[in-house]
Amino acid sequence: MTMKKSFKLSRVAYSISIAIPLSFFSLQLMASDDNYNNIIFPEIEAPSNCDEVAILGKCKKYDGTDPLDTLYSSAGDSTRLYKIENSFGFYVDKKQPSNGNVIIINSPGSLGGVIRGISTNWLEGVSFNDNRIFINLNGQELKWNHTNNGPKIGDGGWISAAAATAGKQLSNNSVYIKNTIFSESGSIFGAYANSASSSYYPPFSQSTITGNTVILDNVTMKPNTSYEPGWGAIVAGAYLFSPTPTFDDSAKSESIDMSNNSVYIKKSNLALDSIAGAFVYTDADSGSFKSNNNLTFIDSSTVNTGDNVYNRLYSASAPNSQDNVLSIQNSTLNISTDKKYYSIRAVYSADKTAENNRLNISNTTINTLNENNVSAKNVDITGGYSYETSRNNKVILDNSVLGRKVTSVNGGISNGYYEKSQIVADNNLVILNKTNMHNDLSVKGGYIHTVTPDKTQ
């Protein structure tokens, strides 16, 4: 039986469609001027068998003794199209839609490869929707047994509910992990989309990547020790890798909707590089491309991060990014910036517009681990960052502690480095309450950076 529940949270409304035990939900988020301390963490009872969950497609369960699979790790980059043994999940050949699949994992057993709700190396115009992964190991450890060919981010990561290349629709795919220990950090995606230039595939266009979710509840992810740490590890509701093809500079990723994706993390201890509701890697000037109403929510957790090319914790990033929320509460962030800068932003970088985005940090300590290193890089906290218009963005810091390498807090930034026609930082706001600050901290409501002296509002 399907039930629909709506939660109204102190002038912030989150409409969540839930099927019991889980048909996962598409998140509809409406920004307001109030705080975001009352976001409800989804309490999901994961099924233990396939007959306990409504299934639209196929279902597979692994309890430690079931047969494992050999799967392609890649979501499309032909330079890394290799197979990974001891994997579990579904794979389809080119141009086949696959919707409503369910993966249930109750024991680590010999599982050590990739986990896929569904994957393919070429989707082209069809859909991967409503695929779900449930993992509950009841405190046991899953040990990745990869070789040096272990999957990188560009291959769809370790766990993806849906992973594809050049797909037209990847919606409402979800990963739910509870009471689980991972032997090292690895990427986890609700939906992963790849149009890598090294494969000479066309860019994404007229694509929908919406309503995808990752939920981590009492999860431990240990640091990497067995391979080069520079590979990076990301947890994202949705991830899009779509650079401009090297053979055609005029081809742009456009007409993309990457909205309503989410990450929920509670009572977890994670070593990784980045967390985002919607993580986007694409070139600038990508045409019509929006990333709205995405959410990243971290509660009662410890995140150990920093010194990687993916140094960022945010909600969304796209040329047009509106009404996105990053909320961190009752948590500890341990950030290393010995080599790289780090950013905590509701919107990481918008080529055009960052508007009505919210960043709330409460009852949280941000430790910057390299404070005594004079060459250590800085950490910024920003509501919305754009290269044109940054408007109506808000940062709230409440009862929190900032390390000395946190050197700037900004409601909104408009970076005029590329000298675009409209460089606007308007009506952005920072609210500080009972927050431990230091003498090197810069606080600005609105901030315009140009080749001429900066303008501060």
Question: Where are the model-predicted features located?
Answer:
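Surface-exposed loop/turn motifs in large extracellular/passenger domains
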Residues: 34-187, 192-274, 279-380, 385-408, ...
